[in-house]
């Protein structure tokens, strides 16, 4: 076989192998059945300890308070309530996001109180030190009272208060911006006759693993945090395997940060994160309580000494919402989504989005894609425009590869003559071929580059489409309402023309009866092959014949945005290769190659045509 076909088969086969490995390593996430619902537990979060001699124990069980003992949360993007029991932020839903494409479906609920399946909440408090005991400071079961009245809203903070009856008055003022950032100011007024010591803390607790946990290898779900510039990601299974720490009374990992950081729980699209004051030391804790099946992320700030008659205040923040790129970036760079006096930037907050191994590609790719979507107004068209930009970026390298492929065609007569002279002497054949390539300045491996260069770009774009919320429920045109999901159409019901429904996504039937977009992908790959005639070797010809259709089924369950990218990429590659081949005197017989692919017996090629490997003879140039 000629080297061009050999290289093309090698590159295509490698791409196929990589996608196969990807398919088996990263299978589609399994849907959670109703039977897998975790039974709610009444156990609450484990209170932290500030000093080695202060024991860490689980807070006793509690009962939920009636709705009248809650403070309503109502902002343009959030709705929910704060429980007066412990002052917990434990009821929060995102107004801008629905569970499904149906606008009448339920909005996404992020936080839920104890007593419901998979309780998920944020809790603040103080850890006692010195002469103080846990009964002297507010905890998970402290009943707070609201100072004044009214709901928590943008520019409408609420204040909670608790008096321990021993001279200490605790106040908690909670405010929220127009996106997803809560500010929590905790104060303690010392009206006793002696100085007291105590330390503020924040906890985000999850009872059991999330119901919709995808357990996808390529996706991080679990604890995410940053301390002094170092990002840490710990999946739920790994949290449950942490070593037992006696001082914590649980399995835990404790990190002391000196300058900045944050910690919390991240899902695919949502996140709840504790953000202490930046520029000051704090302790970051990841914890698991096996008996109660509670996962915790904690921040503990420095011990505070409050003199008699004095008041101490500590402020922190809580992010609870969608991982929108612009929003997260604004918090990282400016500390707020709008210019706000005193707002502290949050270093490294953009890394709470799971950019993956190819972060050096996924970050710039998404940045450009987001800008294109903002300019065009349609994510599908933005993906198409991004494909053109990426192809333009790699055009110089691709051009050299296509030129090398065209020169390889010119060498076919000389290579055939070499084969006849060398006979069975493979060493002689190899030596003469290398001499010929060097003499003609041809790189036989250059034909692999156009295909191989797509692999990291393909995987990076896959990651972007899979994890960024901007692609969630992003429509294109027609039947493609969600570019982050597979093509919903199906051959089974003739693409919606038949009166019966398409197979359920994720089932074997859905993998077999693919949609219109994967079929277009197969056709685009098949058309790209027709720039060259089928190889003379039967094994090669069979590989070439089956490859487009194998890829068609392999990628049929991938996100439609990714399949759209590959289709456009194939069409651009086809056009580039066709133009470059013609510019070097080769005229691909596309229709002839298509016709030959349907004939049972390959027609004998004229000598002149065979010499050019299916291309029309080049015209002689005038000297």
Swiss-Prot record:
InterPro entries: Membr_insert_YidC, Membr_insert_YidC_N, YidC/ALB3/OXA1/COX18, YidC/Oxa/ALB_C, YidC_ALB_C, YidC_periplasmic_sf
Low complexity: bias regions: 601-617
Residue intervals passing through the bilayer: 8-28, 379-399, 449-469, 507-527, 543-563
UniProt-recorded Gene Ontology molecular function terms: membrane insertase activity
Any single GO BP term: protein insertion into membrane
GO CC terms in record: plasma membrane
Keyword line: Cell inner membrane, Cell membrane, Chaperone, Membrane, Protein transport, Transmembrane, Transmembrane helix, Transport
CDD domains: 5TM_YidC_Alb3 (cd20070), EcYidC-like_peri (cd19961)
Cellular localisation: Cell inner membrane
Function: Required for the insertion and/or proper folding and/or complex formation of integral membrane proteins into the membrane. Involved in integration of membrane proteins that insert both dependently and independently of the Sec translocase complex, as well as at least some lipoproteins. Aids folding of multispanning membrane proteins.
UniProt family annotation: Belongs to the OXA1/ALB3/YidC family. Type 1 subfamily.
Assembly and oligomerization: Interacts with the Sec translocase complex via SecD. Specifically interacts with transmembrane segments of nascent integral membrane proteins during membrane integration.
Protein name in UniProt: Membrane protein insertase YidC
Record lineage: Bacteria, Pseudomonadati, Pseudomonadota, Alphaproteobacteria, Rhodobacterales
Gene name in the database record: yidC
């Amino acid at each position: 076989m000629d080297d061009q076909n050999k290289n093309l088969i090698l590159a295509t086969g490698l791409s196929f192998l990589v996608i196969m490995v990807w398919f088996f390593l990263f299978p589609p996430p399994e849907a959670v059945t109703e039977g897998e619902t975790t039974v709610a537990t009444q156990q609450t979060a484990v209170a932290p300890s500030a000093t080695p001699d202060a024991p860490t124990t689980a807070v006793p069980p509690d009962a939920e308070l009636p709705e009248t003992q809650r403070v309503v949360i109502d902002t343009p993007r959030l709705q929910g309530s704060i429980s007066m029991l412990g002052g917990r932020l434990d009821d929060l839903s995102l107004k801008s996001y629905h569970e499904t494409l149906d606008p009448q479906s339920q909005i996404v609920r992020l936080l839920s109180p104890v007593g419901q399946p998979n309780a998920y909440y944020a809790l603040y408090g103080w850890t006692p030190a010195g002469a103080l005991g846990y009964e002297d400071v507010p905890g998970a079961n402290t009943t707070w009272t609201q100072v004044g009245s009214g709901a928590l809203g943008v520019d409408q903070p609420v204040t909670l208060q608790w008096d321990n009856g021993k001279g200490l008055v605790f106040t908690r003022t909670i405010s929220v911006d127009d996106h997803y950032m809560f500010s929590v100011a905790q104060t303690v007024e010392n009206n006793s006759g002696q100085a007291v010591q105590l330390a503020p803390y924040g906890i985000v607790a999850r009872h059991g693993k999330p119901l919709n946990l995808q357990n996808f290898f390529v996706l991080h779900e679990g604890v995410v945090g940053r301390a002094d510039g170092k990002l840490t990601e710990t999946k739920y299974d790994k949290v449950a395997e942490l070593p037992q720490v006696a001082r914590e009374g649980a399995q835990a990992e404790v990190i002391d940060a000196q300058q900045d950081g944050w910690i919390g729980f991240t899902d695919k699209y949502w996140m709840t994160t504790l953000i202490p004051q930046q520029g000051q030391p704090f302790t970051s804790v990841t914890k698991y309580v096996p008996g109660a099946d509670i996962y915790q992320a904690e921040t503990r700030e420095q011990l505070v000494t409050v003199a008699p008659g004095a008041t101490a205040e500590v402020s922190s923040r809580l992010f609870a919402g969608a991982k929108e790129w612009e929003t997260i970036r604004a918090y990282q760079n400016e500390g707020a989504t709008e210019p706000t006096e005193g707002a502290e930037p949050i270093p490294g907050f953009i890394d709470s989005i799971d950019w993956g191994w190819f972060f050096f590609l996924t970050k710039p790719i998404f940045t450009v894609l987001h800008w294109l979507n903002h300019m065009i107004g349609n994510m599908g068209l933005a993906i198409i425009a991004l494909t053109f930009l990426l192809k333009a970026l790699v055009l110089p390298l691709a051009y050299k590869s296509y030129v090398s492929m065209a020169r390889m065609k010119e060498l076919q007569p000389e290579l055939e003559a070499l084969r006849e002279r060398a006979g069975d002497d493979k060493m002689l054949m190899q030596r003469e071929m290398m001499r010929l390539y060097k003499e003609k300045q041809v790189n036989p491996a250059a034909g692999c580059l156009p295909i191989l260069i797509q692999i990291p770009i393909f995987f990076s774009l896959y990651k972007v489409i899979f994890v960024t919320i901007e692609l969630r429920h992003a429509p294109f045109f027609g039947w493609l309402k969600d570019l982050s999901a597979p093509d919903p159409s199906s051959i089974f019901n003739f693409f919606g023309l038949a009166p019966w429904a398409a197979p359920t996504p994720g089932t074997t039937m859905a993998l077999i009866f693919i949609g219109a977009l994967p079929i277009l992908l197969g056709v685009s790959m098949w058309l790209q092959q027709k720039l060259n005639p089928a190889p003379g070797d039967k094994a090669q010809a069979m590989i070439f014949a089956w490859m487009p259709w194998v890829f068609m089924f392999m990628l049929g369950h991938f996100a439609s945005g990714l399949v759209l990218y590959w289709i456009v990429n194939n069409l651009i590659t086809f056009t580039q290769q066709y133009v470059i081949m013609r510019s070097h005197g080769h005229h691909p017989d596309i229709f002839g190659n298509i016709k030959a692919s349907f004939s049972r017996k390959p027609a004998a090629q004229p000598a002149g045509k065979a010499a050019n490997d299916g291309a029309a003879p080049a015209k002689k140039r005038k000297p």
